[in-house]
Amino acid sequence: MSSSNWEKLKKKLDSAKSGRVEKKHSNEKKYLKSVKGKNNENENSYIVDKKRMNELKKFAKENDIPESQVLDAYGVDASKLTRKTNLETLGKYIAMDCEMVGVADDMSVLARVSIVNYHGHVVYDTYVRPKEKVTDWRTWVSGVKSFHMRDAPSFEKVQAEVAKILDNRVLVGHAVHNDLKVLLLSHPRRMIRDTSRFSGYRKLAKGRTPGLKKLAEVILGRDIQSGQHSSVQDAQATMELYKKVKKEMDEVAFKGLSKS
């Protein structure tokens, strides 16, 4: 996308700071068409052009607009999220968060997995097609909708991809045992850093399990989970919380290893 077209796009979006993104302008329709066309060139790749994605995300941030609204408005299919990545550039530390939906018998199943690296960059993000019939999308909190499953990969495919990413890496998460459980995966205890179990953070909750939203607000000065949850945003916040106390959390993990 040329810089001149991008400037036109930015001008048209100046009115969207209230949270609404208009899509009626002809230039925007052309942009929408071009994005969809390029995305459909390889239906099975689930890769969104990084340059285009970064432009939209940057614009959303600069104008205080939710990323999801900008991406939806400009035709970046949210069901085609980043699923392929270079494992060599992931680094040693990754943070993961999952979103779930409700099925029969008041059970929950996996609907989205997001993984970021040490710097908070998204390295894996995909919706997951449930095997069971969904009885409650929980969109108000999960952000997941039925149309997200249109091209979503199977649970088995996502499980295998996540397992490969986790291999020999330190997994950061908040109550991460829930994420591993829904993925039907395990991970060595010495390679897990769970911010919900860190004593320093538990003190803020008077010994109870601290909520991620509260920790992000108090420790990071960041407002998350105000409406629909974003597993990407939650994973990024969790990684930031870990980095704040990395030395202490690593020491606890090493002590546990020496005792075993």
From Swiss-Prot:
One of its GO terms (molecular function) is 3'-5'-RNA exonuclease activity. Residues 12-31 have a biased composition (Basic and acidic residues). It holds the Pfam family RNase_T. Residues 1-37 are annotated as: Disordered. SUPFAM superfamilies: Ribonuclease H-like. GO terms for biological process: RNA processing; rRNA processing. It is an enzyme of class 3 (hydrolase). Residues 93-242 form the Exonuclease domain. Keywords: Exonuclease, Hydrolase, Nuclease, Nucleus, rRNA processing. Its EC number is 3.1.-.-. Disulfide bonds: none annotated. GO terms for cellular component: nucleolus; nucleus. It is found in: Nucleus. Belongs to the REXO4 family. Exoribonuclease involved in ribosome biosynthesis. Involved in the processing of ITS1, the internal transcribed spacer localized between the 18S and 5.8S rRNAs. This is RNA exonuclease 4.
